[in-house]
Amino acid sequence: NRGHARCIATGLKYIFEKEEFDYVIPMDGDGEDRPEEIIEFIKSSEKAPDQTIVGERIKRSEAFIFKFCYFFHKIITLVFTGHSIKFGNFTCLTKSTVEKMINEKATWNSFSGALTKVEKNKFSIPSIRGERYFGPSKMSFSNLINHSLSIISVFKNTVLIRSALFIII
C-alpha cells in the first residue's frame, strides 16, 4: 500500500500542476474499487460541492482470516491515532483537498492517513469491496502490519502522547 500511496501522490501532484479539474477520484484498477460506484461519488459531490467524499467499506470480499486481521488493524490504528479510518484510496477529492494532500509529506507514505490528517471537511458514502479481476490480493499479514504502521506514523505526535498516557495510567 505504500507503493500505491506514492503512485497516487505522484498522480495528484501531476494533475494539480498540469490539468484543470474540479475533482479527482483515485481508485484501484484491480476490481476491488467498483467502477459502478463512481456515480455515487458524482451525485454526492453535486449535493456537497466543497466536501471531499470517502468510500467507506461496508462489506469486504476477503476470507475470514483476512477480515479478522483487518479488524485488528482498524482497532490498533484507532487506539494509537484516535482516528477510525474506514476508507482507502477510493475517494472523491476536491481541488482544495488535492492541494492540501500534495503539500502534506505523509501523502507519500499513507494516503488514508494523510487525508484524515489534512481534511476535516469530508463525509463518507457506503462502498462494497469488489472481487479482484486477477489473482488473490498481495496483502499478507506482514504487509497489513506495515500498512497499519504507515497510517500510525502520520500521527506520530498523537501516538507519542497516547503512548505516554498508556504508560502513566
What are these regions (language model features)?
Residues 29:
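Active-site-proximal cofactor/substrate-binding loop regions of enzyme domains
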Residues 2-15, 23-26, 35-109, 131-142, ...:
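Acceptor/aglycone-binding surface of glycosyltransferases and processive sugar-polymer synthases
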Residues 18, 79-80, 118, 155:
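Alpha-helical structural context
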Residues 113, 117-169:
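Hydrophobic helical membrane-anchoring modules
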